[in-house]
Amino acid sequence: MKKAILGKKLGMTQIFNENGKVIPVTVIEAGPCTVIQKKTVEKDGYEAIQVAFGDIREKLRNKPVKGHFAKAGVSVKRHIKEFKLEDSNSLEIGQEIKADVFEAGERVDISGVSKGKGFQGTIRRWNAHRGPMSHGSKFHRAVGSMGASSDPSRTFKNKRMPGHMGNVNTTVLNLEVVKIIPEKNLILIKGGVPGPNKGLVQIRNTVKA
């Protein structure tokens, strides 16, 4: 990938474009992310940069992590993430990556952990059809058939059944960057992005370019 940054989802709002059309946008506080380590082919077998994002009290980190930040000469941060960038050699340890690495009109992929929905049935979790709600029906929101009986005498793996919904890594592709506000480290993305407000997200160049 060419560019990547960590950010915090702040919420959604709407703005007007030059034609007066309303655009729903998600506001993301992107960076600043500090480079704390550079991985090299000679030493690590691959090239990448390790970045840190988000302030945190130092006493909430253990000694190995504190030492890792001290070696880089950077204050302790909340999140650490590796990115494989094409021009990682141009970045130095201690250098900051800010929201202005992206420009309005660019297309990006955004990853985050989706909102947890708890234990849900098949209708909400898998969008299954429900049964008739009247005329003597004894089947409304039940699972329905789970397979044949005597043969194979079991329920197959990956059968769509009730269970925990949400709280999984999710990526939305090819979203448009509507506006950059560099003085506040804000990126406005058209549409919704995964996760709750204040959730961690990764922004990078789209793979569909």
From Swiss-Prot:
Coiled-coil residues: none
Cellular compartments per GO CC: cytosolic large ribosomal subunit
GO process terms (BP): translation
Keyword RNA-binding: yes
PROSITE patterns for the chain: RIBOSOMAL_L3 (PS00474)
Pfam families according to UniProt: Ribosomal_L3
Keywords tagged on the record: Ribonucleoprotein, Ribosomal protein, RNA-binding, rRNA-binding
Signal peptide: none
GO molecular function: rRNA binding; structural constituent of ribosome
HAMAP family, per database record: Ribosomal_uL3_B
Task of the protein: One of the primary rRNA binding proteins, it binds directly near the 3'-end of the 23S rRNA, where it nucleates assembly of the 50S subunit.
Family, as annotated: Belongs to the universal ribosomal protein uL3 family.
Known partners and oligomeric status: Part of the 50S ribosomal subunit. Forms a cluster with proteins L14 and L19.
Protein name: Large ribosomal subunit protein uL3
The species this protein was found in: Clostridium botulinum (strain Okra / Type B1)
Source lineage: Bacteria, Bacillati, Bacillota, Clostridia, Eubacteriales
Gene field: rplC
